From Swiss-Prot:
UniProt cross-references to SMART domains, sorted A to Z: HOX (SM00389), PAX (SM00351)
Disease: Waardenburg syndrome 1: WS1 is an autosomal dominant disorder characterized by non-progressive sensorineural deafness, pigmentary disturbances such as frontal white blaze of hair, heterochromia of irides, white eyelashes, leukoderma, and wide bridge of nose owing to lateral displacement of the inner canthus of each eye (dystopia canthorum). WS1 shows variable clinical expression and some affected individuals do not manifest hearing impairment or iris pigmentation disturbances. Dystopia canthorum is the most consistent sign and is found in 98% of the patients.
Composition-biased stretches (Basic and acidic residues): 172-188
Region described as PAI subdomain: spans on this chain: 37-93
Keywords tagged on the record: Chromosomal rearrangement, Deafness, Developmental protein, Disease variant, DNA-binding, Homeobox, Myogenesis, Neurogenesis, Nucleus, Paired box, Phosphoprotein, Proto-oncogene, Transcription, Transcription regulation, Waardenburg syndrome
Annotated DNA-binding residue span(s): 34-161, 219-278
Main location: nucleus
Gene Ontology process terms (BP): animal organ morphogenesis; apoptotic process; muscle organ development; nervous system development; positive regulation of DNA-templated transcription; positive regulation of transcription by RNA polymerase II; regulation of transcription by RNA polymerase II; sensory perception of sound
Positions of region (RED subdomain): 113-161
UniProt xrefs under Pfam families: Homeodomain, PAX, Pax7
In-chain residues carrying the UniProt-annotated modification Phosphoserine: S201, S205, S209
Protein name: Paired box protein Pax-3
Organism of this sequence: Homo sapiens (Human)
Length: 479
């Protein structure tokens, strides 16, 4: 901007495209002060070096004419944080000079000439305060702003030269503190008094010269209330684009009779609300995909039944178990009236319990838990591969060399405790299921799926499986 008018300038349509650096790393350029870099706005900066003084003057001048810091940042190609910091410091202290990079401020040592002048002022006017003496030193050009002693230093000199009582000293210190707070350095009176008393030699320096431009104090703005017509216009524009450019915002501001800044803030808030609503909708859609109830990790199970150590001899099999290696199996969910311990009547040599002992022609004993029909309803049950021994798996794959068995297929009847033909099992199950239909919906049930003996050899034939609950059997299922 070459000239600054009182009104905020309108943005012009851009001319030919400018090639700004698009890479993620800033470009390095050579400057008289050293190696500089290019920021995201295209401006050159040097790390560790303050912003040049003429740019600081320009920032204050543009802010004095009512231009917003974001516009100043774009036009001067200075970062927004730098612009805000310079303006904030100028409002507080009236100075645009950069702060100290590091270290502490050197202690001011009062010269003898300054001490004599302080004593002279005090003799001429005994009621003069320390801050008044300090202002008079600046006004008479005895000191400049860099060498003038502080209020506390002047008070210390006065106490040493003019001895007073402790009460008078305390009263003087209290009054001086109150007056110094009223006319602090960053106050309007302090800035004006320092500027008026500044020596003429300092005005020629570019660093020490301060712009004499009062800035408007930032006041809290009342919340904007939009009318229905304005909201309708803004919503229509938001449906077209969520990120309108400066020209679209200005046109929309003219139609809605708002400022471009209010339109920009409204779009920012509207985008935030839209993102929040979109996230909530995605979460609801995801919840609809999830089934209503996942089974918990530990489902409530029915009380487990343990078989007593006493083995009951089945009435249908006259031969007792004589193999010491035979084991009594204790399934967890079965009622205590069933004991799976029997022998094969057609093979008296083996005297092995069906599916329980480990002999050369029989299956190895199952583990103490059965396989659930589906899913992890009971996490304590292993898979069926854990219940079969390697000898059984070898028998299933090798059908040769196995002695011939009778023609009848036998299946274990858990309710009678012995071996029965499959027809009798079905009959007995149908009789017991007449009064147990209400138990089909029990949550935890397990199936006992025993293998059968076939005519050609040992194999796993699909037979009817039974699910056992707490009180009886449920509907049969097959593999």
């Amino acid at each position: 901007m070459t000239t600054l008018a009182g009104a905020v300038p309108r943005m012009m349509r851009p001319g030919p495209g400018q090639n700004y650096p698009r890479s993620g790393f800033p470009l390095e350029v050579s400057t008289p002060l050293g190696q500089g870099r290019v920021n995201q706005l295209g401006g050159v900066f040097i790390n560790g070096r303050p912003l040049p003084n003429h740019i600081r003057h320009k920032i204050v001048e543009m802010a004095h004419h009512g231009i917003r810091p974001c516009v100043i940042s774009r036009q001067l190609r200075v970062s927004h944080g730098c612009v805000s910091k310079i303006l904030c410091r100028y409002q507080e202290t009236g100075s645009i000079r950069p702060g100290a990079i590091g270290g502490s401020k050197p202690k001011q040592v009062t010269t003898p000439d300054v001490e004599k002048k302080i004593e002279e002022y005090k003799r001429e006017n005994p009621g003069m305060f320390s801050w008044e003496i300090r202002d008079k030193l600046l006004k008479d050009a005895v000191c400049d702003r860099n060498t003038v002693p502080s209020v506390s230093s002047i008070s210390r000199i006065l106490r040493s030269k003019f001895g007073k009582g402790e009460e008078e000293e305390a009263d003087l210190e209290r009054k001086e503190a109150e007056e110094s707070e009223k006319k602090a350095k960053h106050s309007i009176d302090g800035i004006l008094s320092e500027r008026a008393s500044a020596p003429q030699s300092d005005e020629g320096s570019d660093i020490d010269s301060e712009p004499d431009l009062p800035l408007k104090r930032k006041q809290r703005r009342s919340r904007t209330t939009f009318t229905a017509e304005q909201l309708e216009e803004l919503e229509r524009a938001f449906e077209r684009t969520h990120y309108p450019d400066i020209y679209t915002r200005e046109e929309l501001a003219q139609r809605a009779k708002l400022t471009e800044a209010r339109v920009q803030v409204w779009f920012s808030n509207r985008r935030a609300r839209w993102r929040k609503q979109a996230g909530a909708n995605q979460l609801m859609a995801f919840n609809h995909l999830i089934p209503g109830g996942f089974p918990p990790t530990a489902m409530p199970t029915l009380p487990t039944y343990q078989l007593s150590e006493t083995s009951y001899q089945p009435t249908s099999i006259p031969q007792a178990v004589s193999d010491p290696s035979s084991t009594v199996h204790r399934p967890q969910p079965l009622p205590p009236s069933t004991v799976h311990q029997s022998t094969i009547p057609s093979n008296p040599d083996s005297s092995s319990a069906y599916c329980l002992p480990s002999t050369r022609h029989g299956f190895s004993s199952y583990t103490d838990s059965f396989v659930p029909p589906s899913g992890p309803s009971n996490p304590m049950n292993p898979t069926i591969g854990n219940g079969l021994s390697p000898q059984v798996m070898g028998l299933l794959t090798n059908h040769g060399g196995v002695p011939h068995q009778p023609q009848t297929d036998y299946a274990l009847s858990p309710l009678t405790g012995g071996l029965e033909p499959t027809t009798t099992v079905s009959a007995s199950c149908s009789q017991r299921l007449d009064h147990m239909k209400s138990l089909d919906s029990l949550p935890t049930s397990q199936s006992y799926c025993p293998p059968t003996y076939s005519t050609t050899g040992y194999s796993m034939d699909p037979v009817t499986g039974y699910q056992y609950g707490q009180y009886g059997q449920s509907k049969p299922w097959t593999f």
